[in-house]
Amino acid sequence: ASSGRKVLYATAEDTWKSATPRFDLQSRLKQKADILGLDWNKIRENLFVLDTVAYPELRDWNTFAETYRYVAEKEKIELAIIDSVTVLEAYRGALKYRVMELARYNQVHGITALYVNQRSTEAWDSYDMAGGIGLAHNLDGTIIIDYGRVYWQDQQVDLAVNRGEFVRIARVLDCRMCNFERRRIRVDITTDGFLRTTEPLPKTEETKA
């Protein structure tokens, strides 16, 4: 949004603007923009928010989809962020079909979309996610970010830590766009709320002409 691109942000986890603005999503994003040296006024100009917390009627799938399409076409949206995809779930088991329907719309209209999801079980570092693993296979790429206790040998090898330690990881599950490594990357959340790697990222092999 700071570069002039139109962004649509749909939130189901947090309200955009509350009576105590110190804690609302808008204030936190502004703080992060300031840290990164980005123009908040430019971001506000190009950022459009569907707040399903403040406006629960948007949790109805038909209402959400109609509003989403209207904003996307009227404002010529280039990037959409759905946080999280539970906003699309009308009933248990429907999530995958909602995401697929929205993904098809985005593809037709040239919109790049990021879908935030949660794991569906207590087991960490797994492929279990709300909507099932089939949900990930219908998208161009899936990245897992998780936190838990290291137990298995392959976790110890990937992360270079001892069994029993608690770590936060990032891991590419699938990607149709480029080559990738499946191994876990250790990450951490900084005091200013950003996700940072705690080790150098692996270099992908360059394709020789």
Functional labels for PLM-detected ranges:
Residues 21-23, 93-94, 156-157:
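Short amphipathic alpha-helical segments
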Residues 112-198, 202-204:
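Phosphate-binding/switch region of NTP-binding enzymes
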Residues 1-6, 209:
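P-loop NTPase nucleotide-binding module
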Residues 22-24, 101-102, 128, 191:
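A generic membrane alpha-helix/interface feature
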Residues 59-154:
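P-loop NTPase motor core
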Residues 4-90:
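Conserved inter-motif catalytic segment of the P-loop NTP-binding fold
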Residues 10, 37-41, 77-78, 107-110, ...:
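Short, surface-exposed, polar/charged, turn-prone segments marking secondary-structure boundaries
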Residues 28-31, 66-71, 99-101, 135-136, ...:
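Short, low-complexity, polar/charged sequence segments that are solvent-exposed and flexible
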